């Protein structure tokens, strides 16, 4: 498919419907490919080889020189006949800065989702934010239902305002054990709350001049000198970066 306009792809599995709304158009995608991938991953038996294929949606962009492409898609699972999403559109897709913003409309509210790579103050619709990630839900009368800011310092929309002293804090690591980072210096009691996120520096990059890859973890618990994360064991690293965040929910 040639994406002259945004496309919506719909699947149905048993009683569950699923929409994939690809918001990119020809300015950032040359073509959309619908393909069946093998349903098996290791052909250890004939029954494995007979596993039904997995349908995939591929967005493709080509150029003779290095390029940057940013994709935006809204994924909507639902069990009703009609999707709860009325419309979705891409408000910003700046390849130079990496800033992206999406507006998703429902019958009774509108969500604004903002992703950036810096702390520049930007405005999309009724939302002004400085941070790497922000989400705001607004009702049909313009009242803010809830707002969330991650790794940022400021978010404002109507009567809702969030301010953080700093977007992130870097902590030096003394050692690691299973799912726990042990810190060189103590932290304040509320600096690493349950459910917050941190980034851990990975191995050296494959090419010089590139940043080290980082892995994100969700915090399960913390003491003054340690942070334990959920689900996965941690790896040796010299430092971790706490991503500060705040969520507010307003009564309507």
Positions of the model-derived regions?
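Trp/Gly-enriched beta-strand surface patches
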Residues: 1-54
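Non-catalytic terminal regions with compositionally biased, polar/charged low complexity
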Residues: 56-72, 76-252
């Amino acid at each position: 498919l040639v994406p002259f306009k945004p496309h919506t792809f719909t699947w149905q599995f048993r009683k569950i419907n699923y929409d994939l709304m690809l918001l990119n158009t020809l300015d950032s995608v040359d073509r959309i490919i619908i393909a069946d991938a093998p349903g098996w991953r290791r052909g250890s038996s004939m029954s494995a080889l007979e596993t039904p294929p997995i349908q995939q949606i591929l967005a493709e962009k080509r150029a003779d020189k290095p390029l940057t492409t940013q994709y935006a898609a809204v994924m909507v699972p639902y069990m009703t006949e009609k999707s709860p999403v009325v419309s979705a559109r891409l408000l910003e897709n700046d390849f130079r800065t990496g800033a992206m913003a999406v507006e998703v409309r429902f019958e009774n509210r509108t969500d604004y989702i903002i992703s950036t790579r810096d702390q520049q103050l930007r405005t999309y619709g009724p939302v002004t934010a400085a941070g790497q990630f922000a989400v705001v839900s607004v009702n049909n009368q313009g009242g803010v239902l809830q707002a969330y800011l991650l790794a940022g310092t400021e978010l404002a929309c109507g009567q809702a305002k969030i301010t953080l002293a700093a977007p992130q804090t870097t902590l030096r690591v003394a050692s690691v054990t299973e799912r726990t980072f042990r810190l060189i210096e103590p932290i304040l009691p509320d600096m690493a709350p349950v459910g917050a996120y941190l980034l851990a520096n990975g191995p050296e990059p494959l090419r010089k001049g590139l940043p080290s890859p980082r892995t994100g973890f969700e915090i399960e618990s913390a003491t003054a000198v340690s942070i334990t994360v959920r689900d996965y064991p941690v790896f040796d690293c010299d430092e971790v970066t706490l991503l500060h965040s705040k969520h507010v929910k307003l009564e309507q």
